[in-house]
Amino acid sequence: VVQPNWEKTGLNIFKVYGMNSNYLSITTTTKIITENKRYDVIIVDESHKLSRRYGKQHPSFGQVYNIQGFEDCNSHLEILQKMGQQIILMYDVLQSIRPANITREMFQRLTDGYEKKFLHTQFRIQAPKGKNYTSDDYVNGIKYLLYKDTKLLSSELTNYNPNFNREVFNDKSPDAYFGYVTGKPMHQLIEWIEEDRNFNAEHINRVLSGMFCCATVDKWSIAHGKDSSITHFHEDELNRRWNSTQENWININDADAEEQIGSVFAVQGIDLNKVGVMIGPDIQVNTDGMLEAVPDSHINTNNKFSVEEMKDPDNQFEFTLYILNQYYVLLTRGIDGIRLGFWENEAFRKYMEDTLNIKK
């Protein structure tokens, strides 16, 4: 069971390895639940994105609770547990990105008694040869940067090593895995990935962005998807639009495919070679020196609680986690390297430099 944006890719991968038996299905949660068959084993990729009963989501996610036998279920995970004799779940608490996703508490309750194993290494991230730091140093550093004040790092839900090598964030050499730009973020990030593409034509490089809006970044609408004349990011004379689709985005045939700016929904579960990430004003440093999400600067309404729900401090905290998780996904897409840019958010740059002890 995979995310919709990865279904076709997953089918092709399994076919390449000859795993296209009638006894094997590559599908999505809503499809497998609607078919309502029974399976010996169900493996769920990105189970942190399994849906729960919640109003703000695509209607198809809620319609499955009308199927006979599933009326009393409160999440897709509960339904899948009824359908499979054995359930294997790939879960990352740091990648739940909207209120309709299964909550941490629901997941813990439903998997009580399950055997739990941690993934200790991010194989998608490759530190350059000859460096003293590793991919784990980078991932643990990003976790510390985003979540140090959330108490998640000390929980049993995530794997975190506080003794990461900060050299990964202080490597100033041209082949450094990590780096960041100052000044005009979109210009510089595009220039960086295009320079790499000149030397490595086979590389799949993209600029990605948090889902923010401000005076120079327009709000996105689903109606904009196929109209290449509508752009959203404006930096001097340079204009770019959001990804035109979420499904199989990196393989689309649009004339401006490589120029589109990718959102978290287009790249979750996707590996890229080199990645530029723009961090915007939807995440700010508050008066207590902690990261806090700003609802008015975030464009996707399905990522937000209602106005009434946001009066609850617990939901305010959860919303901040959703935005932090979105940036965590973006910051862990690059195999060969990443550069950060800050769109109207120099406060975050300074916060990052101080938190990770980056020497200027």
Model-found features: residue ranges?
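Conserved RecA-like P-loop NTPase helicase motor core
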Residues: 58-75, 249-259, 298-321
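Conserved RecA-like ASCE ATPase "motif II neighborhood" in helicase/translocase motors
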Residues: 13-81, 259-263, 326
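C-terminal accessory regions
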Residues: 83-88, 260-360
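Signature of the SF2 helicase/ATPase Hel1-core->accessory helical subdomain module
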Residues: 43-126
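Conserved helicase/translocase motor-coupling segment
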Residues: 100-103, 115-291
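Conserved Walker A/P-loop ATP-binding site and its immediately adjacent core
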Residues: 1-12
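Beta-sheet entry/capping signal
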Residues: 39-42, 86-89, 96, 115-117, ...
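C-terminal/domain-terminus segments
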Residues: 100-113, 225-233, 343-360
